[in-house]
């Protein structure tokens, strides 16, 4: 069986849709929102790599590595903020984060 670009784009679109649904359907838990954002970024990376392989160009793969680096930094900083917030407030609910707006 030959796997062409439509298979990659279908999987990527499905992952992107699941990530968007995770953000819109679950607005209570910050960790699930962060995981949904990571799923969206991963689906975008699959698109970059698929088009890069299809067009025989390395720019998409280099950009995917850049996005992975930024996503890892975003996840580390987001989880560190959540740990500090949980230590101070005792909860990581989104409603408690909205109280911090001032």
UniProtKB/Swiss-Prot annotation:
It is a multi-pass membrane protein. It comes from the Bacteria. Keywords: Cell inner membrane, Cell membrane, Membrane, NAD, Quinone, Translocase, Transmembrane, Transmembrane helix, Transport, Ubiquinone. GO terms for molecular function: NADH:ubiquinone reductase (non-electrogenic) activity; quinone binding. The keyword NAD applies. It is an enzyme of class 7 (translocase). It is found in: Cell inner membrane. Gene3D superfamilies: 1.10.287.3510. The chain crosses the membrane at residues 5-25, 31-51, 66-86. It catalyses: a quinone + NADH + 5 H(+)(in) = a quinol + NAD(+) + 4 H(+)(out). GO terms for biological process: ATP synthesis coupled electron transport. GO terms for cellular component: NADH dehydrogenase complex; plasma membrane. Its EC number is 7.1.1.-. NDH-1 shuttles electrons from NADH, via FMN and iron-sulfur (Fe-S) centers, to quinones in the respiratory chain. The immediate electron acceptor for the enzyme in this species is believed to be ubiquinone. Couples the redox reaction to proton translocation (for every two electrons transferred, four hydrogen ions are translocated across the cytoplasmic membrane), and thus conserves the redox energy in a proton gradient. Belongs to the complex I subunit 4L family. NDH-1 is composed of 14 different subunits. Subunits NuoA, H, J, K, L, M, N constitute the membrane sector of the complex. This is NADH-quinone oxidoreductase subunit K. It comes from Bartonella tribocorum (strain CIP 105476 / IBS 506). The lineage of its organism: Bacteria, Pseudomonadati, Pseudomonadota, Alphaproteobacteria, Hyphomicrobiales.
């Amino acid at each position: 069986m030959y796997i062409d670009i439509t298979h990659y784009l279908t999987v990527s679109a499905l992952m992107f849709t699941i990530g968007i649904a995770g953000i819109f359907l679950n607005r209570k838990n910050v960790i699930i929102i962060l995981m949904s954002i990571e799923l969206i970024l991963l689906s975008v990376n699959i698109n970059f790599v698929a088009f890069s392989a299809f067009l025989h160009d390395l720019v998409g793969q280099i950009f995917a590595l850049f996005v992975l680096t930024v996503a890892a930094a975003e996840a580390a900083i987001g989880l560190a903020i959540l740990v500090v917030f949980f230590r101070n407030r005792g909860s990581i609910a989104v409603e408690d984060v909205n109280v911090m707006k001032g």
